[in-house]
Design a protein with these regions (language model features):
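Extracytoplasmic cell-surface/polysaccharide-interacting catalytic and binding patches
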Residues: 1-49, 142-161
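Structural recognition of the beta-strand scaffold that forms the well-ordered cores
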Residues: 55-57, 82-86, 124-126
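Extended, low-complexity, intrinsically disordered C-terminal regulatory tails
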Residues: 44-70
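Short, flexible, solvent-exposed loop/turn segments with mixed acidic/basic and small polar residues
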Residues: 68-78, 113-116
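Acidic, His- and aromatic-enriched active-site or binding-groove loops in soluble protein domains
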Residues: 73-93
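Catalytic cores and adjacent binding grooves of peptidoglycan-active enzymes
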Residues: 87-161
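Amphipathic alpha-helical interface surfaces
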Residues: 38-42, 65, 81, 91, ...
Length: 161
């Protein structure tokens, strides 16, 4: 099922853990609508800007899958409102800065950020119906969360070490 021009339901629900453990990771109609909104409002503009495929490393998670991986059943992933992503060839911190300044989102987290490796970690981003998004921006270094994105050195619109 195509959710938007470049994103399918299959890639939004793919989970190696669900496959290995025989967990049904099929979303309901409400979650599918939320995934479609996420694709149109965040993922398509992101793909268009960088002109590169966006890799979804974690999308929808059923309650059973959340339990299997130690995630909360109330996670926005379980509502079809969140994805973890990367764009190969673009530092994750650069993608996070673009998202912060160019799309409406509920929560943006630069996960497992290491200032020595701007391409490391991954980006968690969530979206729900327009007008009710918190625009919360956090960085997680593997131990603690902090407000905002880390300051980086930029040159020519790109992050430099």
């Amino acid at each position: 099922m195509q959710l938007s021009k470049h994103f399918t339901l299959k890639e939004m629900i793919k989970s190696m853990t669900a496959t290995r453990k025989g967990i049904d990771n099929t979303p309901g109609a409400g979650e599918i609508k939320s995934l479609g909104d996420l694709c149109y409002e965040i993922l398509e503009p992101l793909r268009a800007h960088f002109d590169k495929p966006v890799t979804i490393t974690s999308g929808y998670r059923s309650e059973a899958l959340c339990e299997a991986i130690g995630s909360k059943k109330t996670s926005q992933h379980a509502k079809g409102q969140a994805v973890d992503l990367e764009i190969f060839g673009v530092p994750n911190i650069q993608v996070a800065y673009w998202l912060e300044n160019n799309v409406d989102f509920d929560q943006l987290i630069m996960e497992f950020f290491d200032p020595e490796d701007p391409a490391g970690g991954w980006i968690h981003i969530s979206y729900h119906e327009s007008g009710s998004n918190r625009k919360q921006v956090l960085t997680f270094d593997g131990k603690k969360y902090s407000e905002g994105l880390p300051e980086m050195k930029w040159s020519g619109g790109k992050v430099v070490n």
